[in-house]
């Protein structure tokens, strides 16, 4: 039996129409455009303002975009893995809601949560379902309504986050394309540096936790920045060395869009020219697990079969990693 690979054969995304600019934030907190651009490189971010719509709404729209533009029948999907840090509810899973709404039938579906790298974790998990030989098509969606947990009285964190969703379809192939390798890591030493302090079983919601604003993202920015630069750079070097890749072999670097200075550091460490790096943080901010698939969607028309992509991310926990992908189709042919 020939080796089975898991190829990315389609991408989709959805971004809400409403925008929060740096000028808007200047009216809410003590900040300004120059301060935000200098520190993180974000000009604006998208927001899903409807309080009755959660991450599932964004995921549904992203999946529909993929189905419509690529001519995919939802009934052909064997399973759905949903990456999110902003699920609609603790239970049921957001994945089950999405699978039903997009018309996939009674397929298996589940949520994954590994902070901002959840998409690359889910990509490797989905690829292994394909490699098992039991499944032909796995839909991997990353969806985030991060603004629901953003404190718009905190000048340190409110400029960072935006809402959005992106997705990819993994399909079985015997060609030498697809998810070729992944390095995934975690270390709980970072727990207290990037956290939502309340709402889980360790600290259930009370009047006190609400009054203390513990249901919003808390971040110690300098600590997180230092670890992110080191760990994202190291994971990229690790996957390049494991696969004998030089910087000349890489067509595109797809970094998590958390901070422009982190992205710059990763590109320098890999020795890759900046024109090979996908960057859209200025327009969308940090959409957590969704940043990488949103990049793939935005750059799809430039991607060619055989292109070598290295994706890398870092997040709470700490969690981090990198994935090596050989692109499976010419994006210029897609609507």
Swiss-Prot record:
Keywords: Acyltransferase, Cytoplasm, Fatty acid biosynthesis, Fatty acid metabolism, Lipid biosynthesis, Lipid metabolism, Multifunctional enzyme, Transferase. Gene3D superfamilies: 3.40.47.10. One of its GO terms (cellular component) is cytoplasm. Residues 257-261 are annotated as: ACP-binding. GO terms for molecular function: 3-oxoacyl-[acyl-carrier-protein] synthase activity; beta-ketoacyl-acyl-carrier-protein synthase III activity. Its EC number is 2.3.1.180. It catalyses: malonyl-[ACP] + acetyl-CoA + H(+) = 3-oxobutanoyl-[ACP] + CO2 + CoA. Pathway: Lipid metabolism; fatty acid biosynthesis. It comes from the Bacteria. Pfam families: ACP_syn_III, ACP_syn_III_C. The last Arg residue of the ACP-binding site is essential for the weak association between ACP/AcpP and FabH. Belongs to the thiolase-like superfamily. FabH family. Homodimer. Catalyzes the condensation reaction of fatty acid synthesis by the addition to an acyl acceptor of two carbons from malonyl-ACP. Catalyzes the first condensation reaction which initiates fatty acid synthesis and may therefore play a role in governing the total rate of fatty acid production. Possesses both acetoacetyl-ACP synthase and acetyl transacylase activities. Its substrate specificity determines the biosynthesis of branched-chain and/or straight-chain of fatty acids. HAMAP family: FabH. This is Beta-ketoacyl-[acyl-carrier-protein] synthase III.
């Amino acid at each position: 039996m020939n080796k089975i690979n898991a190829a990315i054969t389609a991408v989709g995304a959805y971004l809400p129409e409403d925008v929060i600019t740096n000028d808007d934030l200047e009216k809410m907190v003590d900040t300004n455009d120059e301060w935000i651009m200098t520190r993180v490189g974000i000009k604006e971010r998208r927001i899903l303002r409807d309080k009755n719509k959660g991450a599932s709404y964004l995921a549904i729209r992203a999946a529909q975009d993929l189905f419509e533009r690529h001519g995919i029948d939802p009934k052909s999907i064997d399973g759905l893995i949903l990456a999110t840090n902003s699920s609609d509810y603790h239970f049921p899973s957001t994945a089950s809601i999405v699978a039903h709404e997009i018309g996939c039938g009674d397929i298996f579906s589940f949520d994954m949560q590994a902070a901002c790298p959840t998409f690359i974790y889910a990509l490797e998990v989905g690829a292994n379902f394909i490699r098992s030989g039991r499944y032909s098509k796995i839909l991997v969606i990353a969806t985030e309504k991060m603004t629901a947990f953003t404190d718009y009285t905190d000048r340190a964190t409110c400029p960072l986050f935006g809402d959005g969703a992106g997705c990819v379809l993994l399909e079985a192939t015997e060609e030498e394309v697809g998810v070729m390798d992944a390095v995934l890591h975690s270390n709980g030493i970072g727990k207290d540096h990037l956290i939502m302090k309340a709402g889980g079983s360790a600290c259930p919601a009370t009047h006190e936790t609400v009054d203390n604003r513990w249901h919003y993202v808390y971040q110690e920015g300098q600590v997180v920045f230092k670890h992110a630069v080191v760990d994202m750079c190291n994971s990229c070097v690790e996957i390049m060395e494991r696969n004998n890749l030089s910087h000349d072999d890489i067509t595109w670097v797809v970094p998590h869009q958390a901070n422009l200075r982190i992205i710059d550091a990763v590109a320098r460490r890999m020795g890759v020219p900046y024109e090979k790096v996908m960057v859209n943080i200025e327009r969308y901010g940090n959409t957590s697990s969704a940043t990488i698939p949103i990049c793939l969607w935005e750059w799809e028309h430039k991607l060619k079969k055989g292109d070598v992509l290295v994706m890398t991310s870092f997040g709470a926990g700490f969690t981090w990693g990198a994935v090596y992908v050989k692109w499976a189709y010419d994006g210029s042919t897609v609507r």
